[in-house]
Amino acid sequence: MKFGREFETQMIQEWKEAYMDYRSLKSIVKQILRYRLQKQQRPPPPPPPPSTGDTVPLKTDGGEGGGGGGGGGPGLSRRISLYRAFSGLTNRASRSPKKSHKHHNPLSSKRHHHHHNHHHYHLFDDDEEQIILINEDETASYTTTFLNSAEEGGEMEVQFFRRLDGEFNKVLRFYKQKVENVMEEADELSRQLNVLIALRVKVENPHVHLPPDLNSVASAPSSPHSTMRTPAPSPMDVIREMEKTEDKKVFKPAPVEMLDHVKLKIDPETPLLTLKMMILGLPSEQTFSKPELRRAEELMNRAFVEFYQKLRFLKSYCFLNQLAFAKILKKYDKTTSRNASKPYLNTVDHSYLGSCDEVSRLMSRVEATFIKHFANGNHREGMKCLRPKTKREKHRITYFLGFFSGCAVALAIAITVLVHIRGLTKSEGRHQYMENIFPLYSLFGFVAVHLFMYAADIYFWSRYRVNYPFIFGFEQGNDLGYREVLLVGSGLAVLTFGGVISNLDMEMDPRTKSFSVITELVPLALLVCLMMVLFCPFNIIYRSSRYFFVGSVFRCLLSPLYKVILPDFFLADQLTSQVQTFRSLLFYVCYYGWGGDFKRRTHTCYDSEIYKELYLVVAIIPYWFRFAQSIRRLVEEKDKMHGLNALKYLSTILAVAARTIFEMKRGTYWLTVAVTTSSIATLFNTYWDIFRDWGLMNRNSKNPWLRDKLLVPYKSIYFIVMVANVVLRLAWMQTVLGIKEAPFLHKRALVAVVASLEIVRRGIWNFFRLENEHLNNVGKYRAFKSVPLPFQELGGSKSV
């Protein structure tokens, strides 16, 4: 793989715009190469122009003499020193402060140009020509002067160095800002951990009273970092309970008195806590109980893990950009036969990007602190928690995916052949089968279609580098890829088709006047198996993903009482497209319960008043989830857009209720109500899909009527999916227009087709919804989760 593609693959996608623009610099180098090739073909062979005669010795000196000899040994050592400078950032602490912290660049000139020239000539061989001059101003911005700009074609090289300086300064500013941010966060984590240690002391010994002299060291506040070039101790150095003296260790406990000035922030995360805080309010006094300690330790654990991830990202950002500068300058040298990479890379090495080792030093402090305070001194367990889990691609997943897919296709063909051979479409029992058995199996079909659409979404999210695991908050290393989701969907399809084949008999036993009990219980057995797998406590069949799904469903069921997060309202949106699945579940209860005789394939569910009421309720429930979530977010965030979103779902609830009542009662009045409410809901939902969820239809954007940033390279795709979304939104017209059956389709099959089209529409919506969310994260450089800290000062909202 070429470096450009590898560079884009290894990027932190949310920081993509902050990386060096390797592609644009490479395009300028290609322009220089094309110009030089044309220049070589332009003049006739004899006699060469004077400019060519002047150029040949320079090329010989740079390529064979000074450039070859000086670029072979020193150039190679320069590249090695570049990699060593990055990988050994933790070793820079052992160097002298002058080299480690002062960003003195012998190639940059601020005021004394003679000093610059002195060092410059020491970096070139005697027969090498000085090509560039690099200056650094008071704002730590670098400007490169190309000294051979008067040459023919020199303006392109001037453009190259101007663009290179712009990218270098951009990277420097971003990196310095992020380092300052993590240093401030390290200060806050230090104070938070100091309070946590005091809380531990208080909980384990509530009556402890420590003399002030023992608390003096532990209570010493962390000094703010005025500059990162001073050899002051890292913020993590203040977190110490044990200090060595000459001969023994002296115990330095954290000051318990600091607990009088802070309070534990307990966000209600369970319905019981939410109701309790709504009724009683926040507790006025600290109890210093073990549950509070466990909660604080859990939050601090998550905060340290997330903070360590930030440091890893910064370290990767630093290394990749240094490597990109080395690669593009090497390509420039090869194209122009010059040796400009040596001075420029030396500047990079002595800049803040190459010489600041605060990130690596802070990483080692975080590791030591986390292992000591959260892993009981177990280095392996501590690093296992801090480092992200790498996902292993397993060949058996691909094998079983192919196996189950082949089985599903074979069974589908077998069903088609059996229906044709037996003439089941013209059988007397066809209507009985479609009214009783087909709705049972259609439930699994809806779930399988949704799984296939979700797998397609994951594939395209990965292809266009949408960071969906971060957006959904999946556990690192345990998130499912599209192969795993396809495997689950194909396995479910195999079980469903196998059950359908067992129930294809259309005639009862003439002796018993009933169907086989075993075959009639196959759909129920499949449903029970599906539920058992979903709630299986053993670590099989993607337990972490199953539990994540079950937990999200549970929070949706109690929507107003839980804080709304993206995975929960995203799942609730998925459930709004599975209304027919909920109705199929209701039919299961009725058919195998109070209203059916499964042995004779008869039921009275559609005549039951209870069933009719529940038929309406289960269709509204998914939209109620989203309505309640929007109200909760409106109350918490005070954003009026959540209120409008709640109105959108309320209009949909009214439309679904009106269509359901019209389906049961008919009549002109309910037809008018159904058409009116459905039209309003369709317009509202279509506007929200395109304008709000997808962020499209911006006429002033760089891409007219779309948005400024697009991940899909073909703009026509966006217009096609907008039209498709509107068309699929109108599937409700099948109900109000009274379309009961289509050619070769039973009315139950038609309902299943319409429901499947809604699932397909939801799958399309998913991709562009997450694309817009990802681009919002990119625009805000939001690559980390916000983890709340457990303690804050009394009388204020600030953390400790």
Curated annotation (Swiss-Prot):
<dbReference type="Pfam" id="PF03124">
    <property type="entry name" value="EXS"/>
</dbReference>
<comment type="function">
    <text>May transport inorganic phosphate (Pi).</text>
</comment>
<feature type="transmembrane region" description="Helical">
    <location>
        <begin position="671"/>
        <end position="691"/>
    </location>
</feature>
<dbReference type="InterPro" id="IPR004342">
    <property type="entry name" value="EXS_C"/>
</dbReference>
<dbReference type="GO" id="GO:0006817">
    <property type="term" value="P:phosphate ion transport"/>
</dbReference>
<feature type="topological domain" description="Extracellular">
    <location>
        <begin position="505"/>
        <end position="520"/>
    </location>
</feature>
<feature type="topological domain" description="Cytoplasmic">
    <location>
        <begin position="461"/>
        <end position="483"/>
    </location>
</feature>
<feature type="topological domain" description="Extracellular">
    <location>
        <begin position="692"/>
        <end position="718"/>
    </location>
</feature>
<feature type="domain" description="SPX">
    <location>
        <begin position="1"/>
        <end position="346"/>
    </location>
</feature>
<feature type="topological domain" description="Cytoplasmic">
    <location>
        <begin position="740"/>
        <end position="800"/>
    </location>
</feature>
<dbReference type="InterPro" id="IPR004331">
    <property type="entry name" value="SPX_dom"/>
</dbReference>
<feature type="compositionally biased region" description="Polar residues">
    <location>
        <begin position="216"/>
        <end position="229"/>
    </location>
</feature>
<feature type="domain" description="EXS">
    <location>
        <begin position="606"/>
        <end position="800"/>
    </location>
</feature>
<feature type="compositionally biased region" description="Pro residues">
    <location>
        <begin position="42"/>
        <end position="51"/>
    </location>
</feature>
<feature type="topological domain" description="Extracellular">
    <location>
        <begin position="420"/>
        <end position="439"/>
    </location>
</feature>
<dbReference type="GO" id="GO:0005886">
    <property type="term" value="C:plasma membrane"/>
</dbReference>
<feature type="region of interest" description="Disordered">
    <location>
        <begin position="91"/>
        <end position="119"/>
    </location>
</feature>
<keyword id="KW-0813">Transport</keyword>
<feature type="transmembrane region" description="Helical">
    <location>
        <begin position="719"/>
        <end position="739"/>
    </location>
</feature>
<keyword id="KW-1003">Cell membrane</keyword>
<feature type="compositionally biased region" description="Gly residues">
    <location>
        <begin position="63"/>
        <end position="75"/>
    </location>
</feature>
<feature type="topological domain" description="Cytoplasmic">
    <location>
        <begin position="542"/>
        <end position="670"/>
    </location>
</feature>
<feature type="transmembrane region" description="Helical">
    <location>
        <begin position="521"/>
        <end position="541"/>
    </location>
</feature>
<feature type="region of interest" description="Disordered">
    <location>
        <begin position="38"/>
        <end position="77"/>
    </location>
</feature>
<dbReference type="InterPro" id="IPR034092">
    <property type="entry name" value="PHO1_SPX"/>
</dbReference>
<feature type="transmembrane region" description="Helical">
    <location>
        <begin position="440"/>
        <end position="460"/>
    </location>
</feature>
<feature type="transmembrane region" description="Helical">
    <location>
        <begin position="484"/>
        <end position="504"/>
    </location>
</feature>
<dbReference type="Pfam" id="PF03105">
    <property type="entry name" value="SPX"/>
</dbReference>
<feature type="topological domain" description="Cytoplasmic">
    <location>
        <begin position="1"/>
        <end position="398"/>
    </location>
</feature>
<keyword id="KW-1133">Transmembrane helix</keyword>
<feature type="compositionally biased region" description="Basic residues">
    <location>
        <begin position="95"/>
        <end position="119"/>
    </location>
</feature>
<protein>
    <recommendedName>
        <fullName>Phosphate transporter PHO1 homolog 9</fullName>
    </recommendedName>
</protein>
<feature type="region of interest" description="Disordered">
    <location>
        <begin position="212"/>
        <end position="234"/>
    </location>
</feature>
<keyword id="KW-0472">Membrane</keyword>
<comment type="similarity">
    <text>Belongs to the SYG1 (TC 2.A.94) family.</text>
</comment>
<keyword id="KW-0592">Phosphate transport</keyword>
<keyword id="KW-0812">Transmembrane</keyword>
<feature type="transmembrane region" description="Helical">
    <location>
        <begin position="399"/>
        <end position="419"/>
    </location>
</feature>
